Amino acid sequence: MIHPSSIIDPNAKISNDVVIGPYCVIGPGVELGSNTKLHSHINIKGTTKIGKNNEIFPFVSIGTPPQDLKYKGEKNSTIIGDNNKFREYVNINPGTSQGGTITKLGNNNLLMVYCHVAHDCNLGDNIVLANNVQVGGHVTIENNAIVGGSCAIHQFSRIGSLALVGGMTGVLSDVIPFGLSLGNRNNLVGLNLVGLRRAKISNKDIKLLQNFYNIVFCNQNFRSNIENLEADMKENKYVKIIIDFINSDKKRPISLPENIK
């Protein structure tokens, strides 16, 4: 069902059961998957592919040119998976040639009011961005992460799986998987124990992660502490996720406790 006040380019690919409310504008390069609902006043442009069962609320803008002065009109795209909810005034920009030309969001994500996802970002699945989270260019947010309201995330930063970032945090450094990070400039303050329990990770593994945290992040020179870990701790699959995250990308520093270097 398409409201007669909406403007749909004839070259757009719209599944038969998509609902498009009043005053929406859909460009020629847009694909909308089955059972997706657009409430009203939504602008989707560019080469934008949106999957199934998404719900998009009023005044959302997706696929308009990236806010990057280096962007010169090169081809780019935005790819969004299934079962996402984008609340009012969410803005998602496509990629640039400096970042692979693609912005990607996975499945089952909730982006609350006024969230911005900049060019070349890569967001996984089951992520929650609370109201007014501002995600800079080239940012990676892994599965099941939660970012509190009014956070600003510096370009090229990474937030690991099942991490929790407290509200109004300025994220300048990478947040480890399962980490809890907050503050004016994000400091690591512990593990996201609530998230770990909700994910049904065993008490044994949670205790081992706590021991890992106390060994690595409660003493100076955390990288040397990792090298000196006992073999059985390094082999734990959750510890390995954190170590691989730390070793995989060094564009931004790792978020650490305030007194650790």
Give a label for each model feature:
Residues M1-S5, P10-N11, N16-D17, N53, ...:
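Terminal amphipathic alpha-helical/low-complexity segments used for targeting or macromolecular assembly
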